[in-house]
């Protein structure tokens, strides 16, 4: 009954105009001006005034840190492929009164009162999630409450596996993710590998592509209950049909973790895992460009007709929902769910599709320019939003290059490449195009970014040659103590900043910034 009432309220409210939450571009969600408050409504206590005061008045230290971060985002080049710039409208929703409400449970079945509008927001978010990925609500459901991607994956394992049942996933040094159960020969790094037995599949190091033949052989021996199709540093498309075949052979669940590529999938510019997977997880803040959260999609309805002619139904929905709450979470973050609903609406627009097409074009141009400048890319190129540069042929590693890039205001991240033995001093750099594409970068701009990257690597090689030891701290010391090196860094940093400042800011206006120089 409560669910029906919530749905009726939702359907009756969709066509009603919504009054704007704020009157300016500021993202501070303060109350109405004090002069608009009737004298009779004034409290006889003092704290409501502080609660309604703006951030710069209540906490100037934090306000100042935020202003510095704005300047960093404006003057720098954001190349971390798991980052993006979300919209003002999403930030307004995330910074709204929806953060105040507790709502353990699900729409229509809460353990707290007063959730009429929380139910409406979550139900609308679920509806938009299915629409964004073109899913039939009779065949797919979605949970929008997971707090982030790693917890979302653990929710799925907990829901569908017994303790110490077996998981196969792409090896972390070959582009996988910690949450897929990474462990070394001597240590269980991810908690997933503590509670479940895990075995990696890997790339064919001669090509940089996933070795599906070896995966199938390993699965035959290991007999996993669940196989993960997903990565954090793999620049090629997954062969979902091939993994589905392996899963069918082993009677294993196929989990697609599309955290990095969900925006591309939503825009229908790369193949969708939904055609093959049983369960799909994703974060919401990477290429999808929403707030920091996660979703779990699951098949429902008729799975097959058994030998007796009876329908066999998927049993994922109740198991996954119960694993999220009450299994591993309490109250959901309603402000995040509300912001996600906004992002999912944006993901169905023509502007969004054009953006994701540009993400791919920029990535291809970036890869081409890097290779023309003599850099080796793992797999020899890219089919998605990222490139993984193998720096070992250049005689340098990702940790050292990352330090120089950061000094010149280029944000990237060191990353393992096949053959690495240390995650702290890996041989690669991972870079992506979603964030800068959100700022309006096109192909020719990424050719320029590749030039800046090349200059930074050249500086890193000079620093390495001058360092008095082989440790990273020796490299940093040499970089900071050499006046010649510092001069080169300052020159490149100025070039980067002047270039970056030509492009629009996202989430705030340049004119409102405190630090504009």
Curated annotation (Swiss-Prot):
It catalyses: (6R)-5,10-methylene-5,6,7,8-tetrahydrofolate + glycine + H2O = (6S)-5,6,7,8-tetrahydrofolate + L-serine. Disruption phenotype: Displays a lethal photorespiratory phenotype when grown at ambient carbon dioxide. Its EC number is 2.1.2.1. One of its GO terms (cellular component) is cytosolic ribosome. It is an enzyme of class 2 (transferase). The modification N6-(pyridoxal phosphate)lysine is found at residue 286. Induction: Circadian-regulation. Induction by light. Ubiquitous. Mostly expressed in leaves, less abundant in stems, flowers and siliques, and barely detectable in roots. Disulfide bonds: none annotated. Residues 1-30 form a transit peptide. Its cofactor is pyridoxal 5'-phosphate. Coiled coil: none annotated. Pathway: One-carbon metabolism; tetrahydrofolate interconversion. Ubiquitinated. Belongs to the SHMT family. Functions in the photorespiratory pathway in catalyzing the interconversion of serine and glycine. Involved in controlling cell damage caused by abiotic stress, such as high light and salt and the hypersensitive defense response of plants. Homotetramer. Interacts with GLU1. Interacts with UBP16. This is Serine hydroxymethyltransferase 1, mitochondrial. It comes from Arabidopsis thaliana.
